């Protein structure tokens, strides 16, 4: 889908933003992409494991 001049979008299938920030925001000719991480849609972190023995 395309973004109009001052539109914002949260991308389906990606982790829900932790704050009130969209994944993508267009402002005129500028396109802003929010910081991304290895957080999965289920809020687990790729490559991180829980050590339950401690």
Curated annotation (Swiss-Prot):
The keyword Hydrolase applies. It catalyses: (2Z,4E)-2-aminomuconate + H2O = (3E)-2-oxohex-3-enedioate + NH4(+). GO terms for molecular function: 2-aminomuconate deaminase activity. Keywords: Hydrolase. Its EC number is 3.5.99.5. It comes from the Bacteria. Optimum pH is 6.6. It is an enzyme of class 3 (hydrolase). Pathway: Xenobiotic degradation; nitrobenzene degradation. Homohexamer. Converts 2-aminomuconate to 4-oxalocrotonate, an intermediate step in the biodegradation of nitrobenzene. This is 2-aminomuconate deaminase. It comes from Ectopseudomonas oleovorans.
